[in-house]
């Protein structure tokens, strides 16, 4: 169980809202979770589960 994620490491979870971990280890969400995805960010759409939009896009740099 990830201490920052509300799901077991081998279970399913929805990272979009509840997950605060940088690296989700859930089998249903292998992409990293972040809140750094402005609209139109191609890299984030490929490698991030966006929690909320932000102009500070560290995972797209």
UniProtKB/Swiss-Prot annotation:
Annotated region (Beta), positions in chain: 1-29
Domain of life per record: Eukaryota
Annotated Pfam families: Metallothio
Location of region: Alpha: 30-61
Lineage of the species this protein comes from: Eukaryota, Metazoa, Chordata, Craniata, Vertebrata
Name this polypeptide is given: Metallothionein-2
Record note on domains: Class I metallothioneins contain 2 metal-binding domains: four divalent ions are chelated within cluster A of the alpha domain and are coordinated via cysteinyl thiolate bridges to 11 cysteine ligands. Cluster B, the corresponding region within the beta domain, can ligate three divalent ions to 9 cysteines.
Gene that this sequence comes from: Mt2
Binding site for a divalent metal cation 4: 33-34, 44, 48
GO CC terms in record: cytoplasm; cytosol; nucleus
């Amino acid at each position: 169980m990830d201490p920052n994620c509300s799901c077991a490491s081998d279970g399913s979870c929805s990272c979009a809202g509840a997950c605060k971990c940088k690296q989700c280890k859930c089998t249903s969400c292998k992409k990293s979770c972040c809140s750094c995805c402005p609209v139109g960010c191609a890299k984030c759409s490929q490698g991030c589960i966006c929690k909320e939009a932000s102009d500070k896009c560290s995972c797209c740099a």
